[in-house]
Amino acid sequence: MSEVLNVVPVIPLRDVVIYPSMTLPLNVGRKKSIEAVKQASNSYNNYILLATQKNGSSSGDVVDNIYDIGTLAKVVQIMKLPDGSLKIIVEGIAKRLVAKYESIDGCIYANLDSLHIDDNYDPSQIDKELKAILLSITDSLKKFVDISGKVSKESLATLINTEEPHKFIYEISTILNTEIAKKQKILEATDIKNKALLLLSCLYEELEILELEAKIKDRVKSQVDKNQREYYLNEQVKAIYKELGEADEESEVTALKSRIEATKMSKEAKEKCLKELKKLKAMPPSSSESAVSRNYIETILSLPWGKKAKVKKDINLAEKVLEKDHYGIKKVKERILEHLAVQIKRDTNAKAPILCLVGPPGVGKTSIGQSIARATGREYVRMALGGVRDESEIRGHRRTYIGSMPGQIIQKIIKSKTENPLFLLDEIDKISSDFRGDPSAALLEVLDPEQNSTFNDHYLEIDYDLSKVMFVATANSLDIDPALRDRLEIIHLSGYTEIEKQAIAKQYLVPKALENNGLTKNEINFTPKATLDIIRYYTREAGVRNLQQKIDGVCRKAVKNLLKDPEHGKVSITQNNLEDYLGVHQFDYGIKNAKPKVGQVTGLAWTSVGGELLTIEALAMPGKGKVKYTGSLGDVMKESIDAAFSVVRSISKDYKLEDDFYEKKDIHIHVPEGATPKDGPSAGIAMTTALVSVYTNKPVRNDIAMTGEVTLRGDVLAIGGLKEKLLAALRGGIKEVLIPKQNVKNLADVDKEILEKLEITPVNSIKEVLERVF
């Protein structure tokens, strides 16, 4: 090399060391390395430094991760690949010491040290000791090639005949799987003896590993041969036993027979198992039929024959568990306690009705089932019936089908490991049927106390007693097959009121959210008004599932703020900062009218998510007595308007109206929020009041709301959903509520807090209503 180079571009190498005198191809993909090749070609007469990275997997600064000694090489050929990378052929020239690496304009450069460290071949250096080391290397290399087979005989002969020791050492180092750090030490070594000893050490390590691998392979091969020999001998023994007509008392069959005899299964089940075991003996162990028989016997043995959980008979404990786990729903808890009390009082084998908890989503139907299990000490198993269409999900598949298995009922019983678990049939109203059968028909036998003592699963083909199981079903609606519904005792769970939701949030939801998000009471606090605003403005549901999600959302944001600002202190969630956590209000609720108006009446409506104020508007215009009603009204509500007209005409003289008053004006009745369908008879008295107000031109009090159905005789009939309607009235700022006198008995279900803040006026007739509203 005639040129004297002080600075050259650098290609950092990963997991490879390139030695002088080597010519080999390299794939170049990194941007800095591609730039180094370009600079070498354009400005450095194709000279480049090939230096190895200390850590090939590091993604940090490459400049600080390169060895100080590398190989100066010349780029012989450059090829561009389609993906933008390069393939180059380099020829190693000499090893050089680097004084400093620098990264300039996307390329790494090496400032070469003036110290000359080239490996020059001097025959006088080869003494007896070096010759002995080189001979040991040659012998070890031959062993290495014999075991690994990495190098052909021709290449080995060429390698052994290499005269120059440096080149000989470098060539051998290249074919070894030695660590990169050790290969780098071989490059850096200046003394030829040290270089040779380093290589010999690497060779010995490689030989030791290869010999160990060979021993392991031999051991595995001998074990496989032994297993094959044992299998062959076992098959011969079986054939001899078969020829002699003697039973092959295999350990597995013997163990199965012992288990069958020891299990307290029914007589029918034991006979079936022994019959199947006899068939299993005559089958080859490797046949698919033997696997089917074995699985069948194991399934029957895994059933909890005679194993029962000790049922707790403490009704006070059951009451405490239900009170602790669920707020409110007093009637539901009372009915469940009555059911448990009867079971405790009567014989445990007595047939009990099947409970079915019906209510909207999120009111706690499934968790009530879990609480009953805890209160009674039974194991809890749950089967989700939503979307089940196949009868085999309940009864199982017959064994003639490949991959057959028991139905979910039997599988869950096996999982519970007891004969008397609490079995929750979740979402029983979501069952549907198709060409594969009707699952609800299969459930008839399961849920009938008169029949489930002999439940027959298609897979088992034997009767299994389910009478000890306590079944509880849940549903969102009563849209259940009539025959199936007839076997259930329905318990209705209504939606929670705002007051109940506030209490549930305080006692259950907020503590749960704090625990789930790693918070403590000292780090965050929800004010009662903030909780109420979450209920009113961010959720609209009968249950509390969305409320839990919103509270979780607030907690997550609070955790983020606390981590970003540890000095922030305790987070307090109030009405004023709630929008910072949950955004703008998502829902609104009805409030009373700003002032009394003619023809505008506040009614009360019940929805699946609670009560609502229902504004009813009536407008009179000159005309010929036509009536128009808008607001997505249902047939029942339209008929209620017609009835109201008749009532108004019948009492017209009381308000000094002319006989033909209704023929001179057209009436338009509208119920706002026209996109929302509305129906039902409970707005009858409100409709009548609106019409009287229009015809007499008298404004209706804005602080009064009413609910009740009206008859043609002017009588006021009872309505439903009174509790929810009164809460909506209180929330909307109403002072007085007119209710049917027949509904006075329902006030016992209403919270005292609501009754104390509202003036409840029972009415019998429309005349009593009209006396209060003007």
UniProtKB/Swiss-Prot annotation:
Predominant cellular place of this UniProt entry's protein: cytoplasm
Cited SMART domains: AAA, LON
S-S pairs: none
UniProt-listed CDD domains: RecA-like_Lon
Family per record: Belongs to the peptidase S16 family.
GO biological process, one term: cellular response to heat
Gene induction: By heat shock.
Taxonomic lineage from the root: Bacteria, Pseudomonadati, Pseudomonadota, Gammaproteobacteria, Thiotrichales
Gene this chain is encoded by: lon
GO cellular component: cytoplasm
Gene Ontology MF terms: ATP binding; ATP hydrolysis activity; ATP-dependent peptidase activity; sequence-specific DNA binding; serine-type endopeptidase activity
Residues where ATP binds: G359, P360, P361, G362, V363, G364, K365, T366
Subcellular location, record wording: Cytoplasm
Protein species of origin: Francisella philomiragia subsp. philomiragia (strain ATCC 25017 / CCUG 19701 / FSC 153 / O#319-036)
Entry annotated with the keyword Protease: yes
Catalytic activity: Hydrolysis of proteins in presence of ATP
Alphabetical list of InterPro entries matching this protein: AAA+_ATPase, ATPase_AAA_core, Lon_bac, Lon_bac/euk-typ, Lon_lid, Lon_proteolytic, Lon_Prtase, Lon_prtase_N
Protein's recorded name: Lon protease
Residue stretches making up the Lon N-terminal domain: 8-207
Assembly notes: Homohexamer. Organized in a ring with a central cavity.
Domain (Lon proteolytic): residue spans on this chain: 595-774
Keywords assigned: ATP-binding, Cytoplasm, Hydrolase, Nucleotide-binding, Protease, Serine protease, Stress response
Keyword Coiled coil assigned: no
Domain of life: Bacteria
Active site: S682, K725
Function: ATP-dependent serine protease that mediates the selective degradation of mutant and abnormal proteins as well as certain short-lived regulatory proteins. Required for cellular homeostasis and for survival from DNA damage and developmental changes induced by stress. Degrades polypeptides processively to yield small peptide fragments that are 5 to 10 amino acids long. Binds to DNA in a double-stranded, site-specific manner.
EC number: 3.4.21.53
